[in-house]
Amino acid sequence: ILIPLTVYVFFKNRMEGDRGPVFFTQNRIGKNGKEFKMYKYRTMELGADKILEDLMAKDPAIREEYLKNKKLANDPRITSAGRFLREKSLDEFPQFINVFFGQMSLIGPRPYLPKEKIDMGEYYEDVVACKPGITGMWQSHGRSDVSFEHRLVLDEYYYRNWSFWLDVTLLCKTVKQVLYGRGAV
């Protein structure tokens, strides 16, 4: 499945004049706070961090939204190929490489950015006590519609209430969310 998606992203980006890499790696916080490189399809324009800095400097509303949610609802940095991948959660597919290497599991808390550690506050220890997952509580309970604080509450709930049946339930809910495209992008 990675091969056809990779070919799609490559050609779609090239048709739009984007010569950047197809894949994107980013340091994330793993189990017990150990950092690892997480793989994703690149869904944003090159220089996305600089673009975000400029947007936040020019527009206080964007700055407030990003500081509250750690994301933008209508992020102008997303490429058209990236929008399609995010709507179907296909941008996460390369994370199976991280699962293969034992850095992630299929289901678990979201792998947070190292710069978000401070913002995680009291939730940090519980969230990093288990392997991060490709999907989990917040992905199956609203995805991008969930605030950063609510994500942490959901991830802590997962840690404190983990069971095989919770994982089965989350997997089914994630499939439903992806099929109906709720909370994507």
Kindly give the residue locations of the regions a language model identified:
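Gly/Ser/Thr-rich helix-start
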Residues: 21, 31, 83, 103, ...
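A short, structured surface patch at a secondary-structure boundary
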Residues: 65-130, 170-177
